[in-house]
Amino acid sequence: MQVSIVNEHKYRELEPLNEMLVKRGGVKMIPEPKFVISGLVDNEEYVIKLRIDLADEFRYSYQNQQWTPFAPSTKNSKLSAITETEHRKETGATWNMRIVQFDKLLITREFNDIQRNVIHVEPNHKYIPVLTIQNVTTGKSTEFQFQQMEFIAVKSYQSARIRHTKRAPRKMNLAPGSSQKPQLIVPDILHSPTYGFTAAPPPFPFEYWLLYPQIQYQIQQLAYSLPMGPPMVPIHHIQCTEASQRVYAPEYGWNSILMPGAHKEQDDHYMFHHEIWAPQDHELEKLHVLTEQKNKPSETPQ
């Protein structure tokens, strides 16, 4: 029977001593414990368990960029051995072909949070995971320990190198299943599928595909285009050539404001033409109307 660690290179990056962050409510272990087992009897049933034991009887402190023991361990430091997580029993042939991982395992620093798949660890103490393989058919159990999996439980990371190593993968949220090969996501970003004029169909409360099947089946775009026109031209892109006309009149000079009707500004928004007059234009227009009425010959009754 042989047992090996799957992600052993991650533990090598955290040497000489890993730090495991623990919080209230429980957090997952980083790296996650994963094992590969070989040499089990195919027709016999096994149960695989994992617990966390206290590595020694000391309490540690971080000084001069290293962990050193300074006091005996506390009473609650041994409570981790009372809880363990296990998989359901499977045949040896199944375990030989499977990666054994404990993704539901959580570690906490609060004794009240102890429950199934939640193990209590005391901060500033050294622990080591213990893998137990129990043969249900014969009743024998075998335990495995790996020194590179030892860790110090901490409330906050003390080593800057370990803090950077564990938080670096969280800088870019990758798609599920692509964390091992982030370069595979780049073609998807550069060449994202399009649905007509939109990058992606928005969510609708009704069945949107019944109205526009060409969004779901892109081949139908050849015969049935989407019922939407080209985008509206922005207003500031419309150039009005009649808005800056200046007319010279000898009696007024180049002052177009005093000339009634000589300088008109047009608003071409959405193809509607509106003449915009200045206040002087209105005053001159009124004066022009009054002058025309005064000079108009009066009609005398015959």
Swiss-Prot record:
Keyword tags: DNA-binding, Nucleus, Transcription, Transcription regulation
GO cellular component: chromatin; nucleus
CDD domains noted in UniProt: T-box
Binding region for DNA: 5-180
Any one GO MF annotation of this record: DNA-binding transcription factor activity, RNA polymerase II-specific
Keyword Nucleus applies: yes
InterPro entries with a match to the protein in the record: p53-like_TF_DNA-bd_sf, T-box_DNA-bd, T-box_sf, TF_T-box
Source organism superkingdom: Eukaryota
Alphabetical GO biological process terms: cell fate specification; positive regulation of DNA-templated transcription; regulation of transcription by RNA polymerase II
Principal cellular location given in the protein's record: nucleus
Protein localization: Nucleus
Protein name: Putative T-box protein 34
Species of the source: Caenorhabditis elegans
Gene (UniProt): tbx-34
